[in-house]
């Protein structure tokens, strides 16, 4: 089953004060708050050396390499524990498609790939913006870190029991990275657009809280959204009421009935459950 790195995202977000997720209480978690914490963004032409103490440089160097080493370490540890990497001794190509009715997970996996890479890029950008003192290297580090994560997932899946290397995943990964880069480079874009997600565990996970660490696989518990923020009109210089900055128009997508935690019989579902597969687009 194609796996997504939401667990990695959460760990990254915890370490970045600049990114606000606005998590509510209860099972339902709103990830990737529509208005990510605004950080000062200078153009490359304005990037310059900032006088720093030796202690400051040491701290930034430590954070930089902890991130560069920590991201792949967390990913690989989780992947080998949960995703069956290494179960296959030969390379497997996958042809998963995108959002067709009979595709793998109905497209929920593709929106998850896009969202996860969007969030990891934005999180890592904020880290490297700090470690590189706003210099251009922040772009190189955040792009390479996020892209390498996506490629590593596909390489691992090529040797997993039932996955395979899927070029479609790499394409939607790139879309997520591209949206994130535009938001970081152009504050006006960020003031209008964001990606977010909502998660509420399905029955299988609600009854087995010890399995919640596998929540990236629980696609039927996820909803993925594109947020259009009316606050952006104020940044265009338009005289609009202040309350508009609290209003968003969300376009979302989710699927139900596709996962191994719903279809039976299996080691996850004892009955011959066969729920209807549903794809839903909503505003």
What are the functions of these language-model segments?
Residues 199-203, 253-259:
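Transmembrane beta-strands of outer-membrane beta-barrel pores
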Residues 173, 218-224, 245, 277-283:
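Residues that define the transmembrane beta-barrel architecture of outer-membrane proteins
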Residues 145, 149, 191-195, 245-251:
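Transmembrane beta-strands of outer-membrane beta-barrel proteins
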Residues 178-182, 224-230, 283:
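Residues on the lipid-exposed face of transmembrane beta-strands in outer-membrane beta-barrel proteins
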Residues 152-174:
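Interfacial helix-loop-helix junctions of multi-pass membrane proteins
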Residues 16-110, 114-121, 125-130, 238-240, ...:
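N-terminal targeting leaders of membrane proteins
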Residues 208-227, 231-244:
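Acidic-aromatic/histidine active-site loop/patch
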Residues 59-64, 129-141, 183-192, 233-247:
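Short loop/turn motifs that connect adjacent beta-strands in outer-membrane beta-barrel proteins
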């Amino acid at each position: 089953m194609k796996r997504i790195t939401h667990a990695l995202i959460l760990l990254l977000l915890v370490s970045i004060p600049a990114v606000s997720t606005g998590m509510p209480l209860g099972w339902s978690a709103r990830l990737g708050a529509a208005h990510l914490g605004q950080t000062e963004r200078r153009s490359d032409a304005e990037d310059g050396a900032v006088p720093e103490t030796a202690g400051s440089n040491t701290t930034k160097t430590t954070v930089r390499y902890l991130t560069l080493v920590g991201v792949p370490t967390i990913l690989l540890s989780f992947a080998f524990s949960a995703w069956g990497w290494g179960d296959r001794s030969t390379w497997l190509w996958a042809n998963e498609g995108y959002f067709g009715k009979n595709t793998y997970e109905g497209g929920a996996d593709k929106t998850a790939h896009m969202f996860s890479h969007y969030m990891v890029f934005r999180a890592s950008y904020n880290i490297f913006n700090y470690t590189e003192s706003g210099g251009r290297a922040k772009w190189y580090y955040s792009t390479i870190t996020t892209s390498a994560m996506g490629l590593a997932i596909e390489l691992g899946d090529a040797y997993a029991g039932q996955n395979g290397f899927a070029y479609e995943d790499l394409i939607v990964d790139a879309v997520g990275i591209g949206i994130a880069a535009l938001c970081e480079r152009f504050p006006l874009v960020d003031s209008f657009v964001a990606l977010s997600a909502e998660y509420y565990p399905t029955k299988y996970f609600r009854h087995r809280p010890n399995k919640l660490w596998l929540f990236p696989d629980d696609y039927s518990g996820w909803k993925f959204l594109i947020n259009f923020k009316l606050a952006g009109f104020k940044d265009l210089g338009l005289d609009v009421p202040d309350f508009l900055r609290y209003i968003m128009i969300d376009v979302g997508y989710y699927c139900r009935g596709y996962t191994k935690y719903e279809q039976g019989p299996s080691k996850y579902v004892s009955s011959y459950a066969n729920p209807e597969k549903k794809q839903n687009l909503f505003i």
